[in-house]
């Protein structure tokens, strides 16, 4: 399942990626409409009306607040969230992350990070490097709270 987020939902796209979901963020309205029409397993998330899309599911997001936006789609996304997929996509560009040897990324991370951590992942598209530091712990705490709140 793919969740295509429109220009008004960039932050929501990042949170969906954190949860391991495929969430492209597309800002061009013409591109959005053709994207939504391509596949029936696409859910189009928007803060605007989409009268002329013919295929795919559409969800109109009413809130401007990220916590409320996630609540609006929680019933749809919760069954799709898998623990082994969390934190597996680039939060910036949605590309699946690839594990790399720490010595391959030594020059791309601060020295203290290189010496403190052993497991690293990289986005092959935008080259952003990820590691399981305190930021990941905070994200995982948020995910756990999100998954258990009713």
What spans do the regions from the language model cover?
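Long, charged N-terminal interaction/targeting segments
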Residues: 1-85
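Short metal-coordination and nucleic-acid-contact micro-motifs, chiefly zinc-binding Cys/His arrays
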Residues: 83-87, 116-119
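Short cysteine/histidine-rich zinc-coordinating motifs and their immediately flanking basic loops
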Residues: 101-108, 134-142
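Short linker/helix segments within small regulatory modules
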Residues: 107-120
